[in-house]
Amino acid sequence: MGSGSIKKILIVDDDVALMRVIREALTSFLRCEVDTSPNPEYGFELALTKTYDLLIFDFSMPMIDGAMLFFLIGKAYNHAEPPRIVPPLLLVTGRGDEKRAQELLKEAGVRGLVAKPFVINRLLEKVKECLPGIESVGSPK
């Protein structure tokens, strides 16, 4: 799979409307396939059954936050036979989460934060930073 391959992205966010907007923006402007889940438990199952190039998780979700979900996926990947490579993570954060989320940037695999509310162009830039080989298919106005 060269850099021209379609990148696969998993979004987990309990804000369904925002998740749909993110998916639409990614698939409109970048060459990628996007799976989504408003439910961290189902997102975990998707991550175990499919292979992704990038994870985009909401930091603040009920039951399991984005950081914990990433940690659990990492543990499962490390214990898989053969061990799997954990894709990079972009965390989407809301107000009040910034301080803890900033600390998570020091963790291996956490590639960036996008604070809500955000401009779609900012998110697209972050995705391109995480996936340097991703191809653009359109240009946002």
List PLM regions with ranges.
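Conserved sequence signature across two-component system core domains
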Residues: 12-13, 37, 55
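Two-component/phosphorelay signaling modules centered on CheY-like receiver
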Residues: 16-35
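Helix N-cap/capping motif at the beta->alpha junctions
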Residues: 36-45, 66
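Short amphipathic alpha-helix used as the core "switch/output" element in two-component signaling
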Residues: 45, 67-85
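Active-site residues of response regulator receiver
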Residues: 58
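Receiver (REC) domain active-site loop signature in two-component systems and cognate sites
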Residues: 61
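Alpha4 helix (beta4-alpha4-beta5 surface) of REC/receiver domains from two-component response regulators
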Residues: 68, 84-86, 96-112, 121, ...
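A Lys-centered signature of the CheY-like receiver
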Residues: 116
